[in-house]
């Protein structure tokens, strides 16, 4: 499968990687599962925003199930898989659980914490590169795939794939925080760890 990504999306993907590294890590040292989940959640959330739903009328964190997410969400997972295949990240199909569950270390941020921390800047990346919300979701999925590739040596490609697939679903089916709201991680829980 060939990746059909525009140059603007490729540039935006680099900005998304920099955003994740800058907001979640110290330098470029970040907790892999948290970085992957956060990038995937942003991708899914951008896709959710592309559907044009009135998100302000629902409580942030509420599940928002839709046919649109069911139809368009799998494209994000396909993009992830295609990128990993093109970059020779081998995956054992028996260890892939996709969007149903992921095993390994849990991300250190909840879905709402991830979105609150990143969504305003993610929307700014989309605007800066003149991308539609769906194009931005694809660019963020590409960024997620890059992070999975970079972390595969330490956590395994399958763990990265599973965390990402679950994050795409979380982002595309969760009402995001309102842009003016900020959800802070609990002070007692570290939000990163050095590899």
Regions found by a protein language model. Name each.
Residues 1-195:
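Solvent-exposed interaction surfaces and binding hotspots enriched for charged
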């Amino acid at each position: 499968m060939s990746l059909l990504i525009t140059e603007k999306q490729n540039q935006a993907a680099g900005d998304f990687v920099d955003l994740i590294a800058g907001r979640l890590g110290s330098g470029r040292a970040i907790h892999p599962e948290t970085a992957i989940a956060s990038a995937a959640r942003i991708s899914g959330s951008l896709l959710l925003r592309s559907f044009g739903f009135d998100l302000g009328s629902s409580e942030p964190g509420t599940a928002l199930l839709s046919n649109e997410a069911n139809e368009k969400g799998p494209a994000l997972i396909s993009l992830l898989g295609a990128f990993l295949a093109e970059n020779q990240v081998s995956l054992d199909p028996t260890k892939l659980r996709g969007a149903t569950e992921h095993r390994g270390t849990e991300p250190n941020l909840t879905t709402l914490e991830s979105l609150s921390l990143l969504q305003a800047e993610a929307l700014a990346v989309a605007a800066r590169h003149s991308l539609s919300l769906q194009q931005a979701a694809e660019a963020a999925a590409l960024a997620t795939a890059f992070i999975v590739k970079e972390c595969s040596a330490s956590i395994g490609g399958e763990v990265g794939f599973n965390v990402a697939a679950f994050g795409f679903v979380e982002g595309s089916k969760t009402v995001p925080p309102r842009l003016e709201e900020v959800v802070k991680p609990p002070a007692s829980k570290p939000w990163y760890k050095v590899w």
